[in-house]
Design a protein with these regions (language model features):
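Short boundary/linker motifs that mark transitions into or out of structured domains
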Residues: 1-27, 82-87, 254-257
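Conserved RecA-like P-loop NTPase ATPase core
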Residues: 16, 47, 69, 117, ...
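Short amphipathic alpha-helical interaction segments
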Residues: 57-68
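Residues that recognize and position ribonucleotide moieties
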Residues: 7-9, 40, 119
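C-terminal flanking helix
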Residues: 66-77, 210
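Short amphipathic alpha-helical recognition elements used for nucleic-acid or partner binding
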Residues: 21-51, 69, 184-187
Length: 257
């Protein structure tokens, strides 16, 4: 069954849209996700190690996995396999990702286009993928997370400047679903709530950050835990103090909890 385009969505629970049929093996779907972020093509030894890093797999298992992925993806509108046969596995050009779509929208200067990009985020990155360690080890996860955070910070700043604090807050909270430990996002959240003139939400955002910082600052083995404020970047506490006084301070220093 021909399908003009297939999209691999990873900005939340992993979905593969536009397939010709279901994946009968979870590893087959995982393989398609892996190939979607390794477009140069990969040999059996590489992708099987990525999907099963803790054990070797037989050629028959690898063959049945790739065959199921090929069957599920089907063909493009011209009858070409989305996953052609060959020594190296490489997805066809009609298979794209939501990260590519996000990136194309994120390059626009129009804040509303950034808003559209942020709507693509549905939850934690690569959520539900059974075999996702490769995304951590080869930097794919970090690169996507960095793209989303940069975009969110740029969009939130633009909306605050336009006096649209609600949109700025929405963008930041969307990004926090994917990158919950980036302190820069919390500084942007403080700015967004302050821009709405809502001191209750400003206090709530800071309380949320302090709770998270407190959880991370108190591992079980620590005998003298840090206070939540000790774990925060000085720029964050300075910004919060100045926002309470009604005089926003400059922020933007990279920091993670």
């Amino acid at each position: 069954m021909p399908t003009d385009a297939v999209e691999v969505a990873v900005l939340g629970p992993v979905l593969v849209h536009g397939t010709a049929g279901p994946f009968r093996r979870s590893a087959a779907r995982d393989l398609v996700v892996y190939l979607a972020f390794h477009r140069r093509g990969v040999r059996h030894a590489e992708w099987s190690l990525a999907l099963w890093p803790d054990r070797p797999v037989s050629l028959s298992t690898a063959h049945s996995t790739s065959s199921d992925a090929r069957r599920a993806l089907g063909c493009d509108g011209e009858g070409r396999l989305h996953l052609p046969r060959g020594v190296e596995l490489r997805l066809g050009d009609a298979v794209t990702t939501d990260v590519e779509h996000f990136g194309s929208l994120a390059t626009e200067d129009d804040p509303d286009q950034i808003l559209r990009a942020m709507r693509l985020i549905r939850g934690p990155l690569f959520s539900g993928l059974h075999r996702a360690d490769w995304a951590i080890f080869d930097g794919t996860h970090a690169n996507i997370e960095a793209l989303v955070v940069r975009t969110a910070l740029r969009g939130a700043d633009a909306f605050v400047r336009l006096g649209r604090g609600e949109e700025a807050e929405w963008i930041v909270r969307r990004a926090l679903q994917l990158s919950p430990y980036d302190e820069r996002l919390y500084r942007a959240l403080l700015m967004a709530t302050a821009a709405q003139g809502n001191r209750v939400r400003l206090h709530s955002a800071m309380a949320q950050l302090r709770t998270l910082a407190g959880d991370l600052a108190c591992p079980p083995a620590r005998t003298a835990p840090l206070t939540p404020s000790d774990s925060l970047h000085p720029a964050t506490t300075a910004l919060y103090r100045d926002l309470l006084l009604g005089s926003p301070a400059a922020g933007g220093h990279p920091a993670r909890l």
